[in-house]
From Swiss-Prot:
This is Small ribosomal subunit protein uS19. Protein S19 forms a complex with S13 that binds strongly to the 16S ribosomal RNA. The keyword Ribonucleoprotein applies. The keyword RNA-binding applies. It comes from Mycoplasmopsis synoviae (strain 53) (Mycoplasma synoviae).
Amino acid sequence: MARSLKKGPFADDHLLKKVQAIIDGKAPKKPIKTWSRRSTIFPDFVGLTFAVHNGKQFIEVYVTDDMVGHKLGEFSPTRTFSGHGADKSKKK
């Protein structure tokens, strides 16, 4: 279910402050470390790199135009697929 249009997109305030500091030139342009997977990607984020936490480690995500409107967590998978169990009788 989509978010209501009257509410608008969501992004954490601390994340927006970090992005604004980089845009204004007050902070060095390095990956922005964040745990906020729920934040929506805004057009201001294009060209920046975010280090998004997946529960175990930080995965670097470079934001492009196609990612605008999606959430940061969509580009940092939390689960690893190790394959289905192999049938031992078929191997012989």
